[in-house]
């Protein structure tokens, strides 16, 4: 399967749109 494109940068988030590229906002409050 295709991997999501997600830069390995620790970014805080409240929702997926706070994150770069195809990262999603994970339960611990950071993009991944």
From Swiss-Prot:
Q: List the disulfide bonds.
A: 6-23, 13-25, 19-31
Q: What keywords does the record list, in alphabetical order?
A: Disulfide bond, Knottin, Protease inhibitor, Secreted, Serine protease inhibitor
Signal peptide limits: none
Keyword Disulfide bond found: yes
Q: Which GO terms describe its molecular function?
A: serine-type endopeptidase inhibitor activity
Q: Which CDD domains match?
A: PlantTI
Residues of the site described as Reactive bond: 8-9
Q: Tell me where it resides.
A: Secreted
Recorded hits in SMART domains, A to Z, give: PTI
The main location is: secreted
**UniProt xrefs under Pfam families:** Squash (PF00299)
Keyword Phosphoprotein: yes or no? no
User: Per the record, what is one GO cellular component?
Assistant: extracellular region
| Family label | Belongs to the protease inhibitor I7 (squash-type serine protease inhibitor) family.
What is the recorded function of this protein according to its Swiss-Prot or TrEMBL entry? Answer: Inhibits trypsin.
What's the record's remark on domains? The presence of a 'disulfide through disulfide knot' structurally defines this protein as a knottin.
Q: What is this protein called?
A: Trypsin inhibitor 3
Source species, please?
Answer: Cucurbita pepo (Vegetable marrow)
